[in-house]
A protein has these predicted regions:
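Glycine-rich, flexible N-terminal cofactor/catalytic loop recognition
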Residues: 1-48
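Short polar/charged helix/loop
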Residues: 16-17, 35-40, 47-94, 137
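PTP/DSP superfamily signal
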Residues: 82-96, 103-105, 113, 117-263, ...
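Short functional micro-motifs and their immediate structural scaffolds
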Residues: 106, 225, 292, 306-309
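Short cysteine-rich clusters marking metal-coordination/redox-active sites
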Residues: 217-220, 283-287, 300-303
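Cys/His-rich Zn2+-binding "zinc-finger" mini-domains, especially FYVE domains
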Residues: 274-290
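Conserved tryptophan-centered aromatic signature that marks the ligand-binding surface of SH3
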Residues: 293-300
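Cys/His-rich, Zn2+-coordinating zinc-finger modules
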Residues: 305-323
């Protein structure tokens, strides 16, 4: 067990066992990041009601939070970071915190690295280097490092309104689909036709700048997406040959191909997506006009970029207007 900051420790399963056996009384909060909780590490339940699916169990001298994480690249850690931060902050106010996984190398290192990034405004490399100066074996797996870089890109916070997060969320939904897991409707973005702006500051900003777009069905004018739903992608430079009339190669001039579609996050009006197919058409929820298509396995944009998963709306089927 190594102390990373005052009162904040990183460790492995053996360190956790010592804490649970009351051999290490100074630890008051135990954050366990394990795929499965070993029977001999089980502790009594309590009246404390944690978030759904989260095991949070106090002992007389100890409060414990268990997150069921696997040490694999595809494990989603971003969605639990705020919960980890809250737990660590509370623990440091009143005592000492041990963050542990099986070996004290990857999962625990990822959480403490993220905590240092947020609390000290450190970039990924700097936060990890600082952690490794206290615990040389700390080394998050590549998937965790990618998510920590996303966390850095969002300004050391989990910003669920940012396009960075929405891309990540869509990719994770695609992974769940590929694993055969059911995806709840609540996992999809709200129907923009039913959403209203409630933040006066945001209303003022939008009326001031007037740069945001609404996308409407060309046939019935129903709102089907807004700027917040759009997932941008880097163009691969899709190009097509242009025949020359003069001498020389007929194919030595090319023209860049623009994106003819808009790719969006999955939304609650997309009933065809909720029916469980791998791919299908996206139709207007009001008039049933065809708007585009979806494919959990991905689709190539006209610009050449491969988008996975793909929820594609054709520009020719929509009208775009500023608001």
């Amino acid at each position: 067990m190594k102390e990373v900051r005052k009162g904040l420790f990183i460790g492995d399963a053996k360190d956790a066992e010592a804490v649970l056996s009351s051999a290490t009384q100074k630890i008051t909060h135990l954050l366990s990041l394990l795929a499965h909780l070993p029977p001999h590490q089980s502790v009594p339940s309590s009246q404390h009601l944690p978030p759904e699916g989260v095991q949070w169990q106090p002992l007389p001298h100890l409060t414990r939070l268990w997150l069921s994480w696997k040490d694999i690249d595809d494990q989603n850690i971003i969605d639990s970071l705020d919960l980890c931060f809250h737990f660590i902050d509370n623990g440091l106010r009143t005592g000492h915190v041990l963050v542990h996984c099986l070996a004290g190398v990857s999962r625990s290192a990822a959480v403490i690295t993220a905590y240092l990034m947020r609390s000290e405004c450190l970039f990924v490399e700097d936060a990890l280097s600082s952690l490794q100066s206290k615990s040389a074996s700390a080394r998050p797996n590549d998937g965790f490092l990618d998510q920590l870089r996303l966390f850095e890109s969002m300004g050391f916070k989990v910003d669920k309104k940012s396009s960075i997060y929405k891309k990540f969320h869509s990719e994770k939904l695609g992974q769940l689909y590929n694993l055969g897991e059911s995806i709840k409707n609540s996992s999809f973005a709200e129907d923009p036709a039913l959403c209203t702006l409630t933040d006066p500051y945001e209303q003022h900003q939008q009326s001031d700048l007037c740069t945001h777009l609404l996308y409407r069905c060309k046939k019935c004018r129903r709102i089907i997406a807004c700027h917040k739903n759009v997932l941008t992608h880097e163009q691969e430079g899709g190009r097509i040959p242009i025949e020359k009339k003069d001498k020389g190669s007929l194919w030595n001039e090319v023209r860049t191909v623009d994106c003819t579609s808009v790719f969006v996050e999955p939304m609650q009006w997309m009933t065809a997506v909720q029916e469980g197919g791998v791919l299908g058409r996206l139709s207007c929820a009001s008039c049933n006009a065809r708007l585009g298509s979806f494919n959990w396995a991905g689709t190539q944009c006209s610009c050449g970029t491969w988008v996975v998963p793909a929820f594609q709306l054709h520009k020719s089927r929509m009208d775009a207007s500023k608001f």
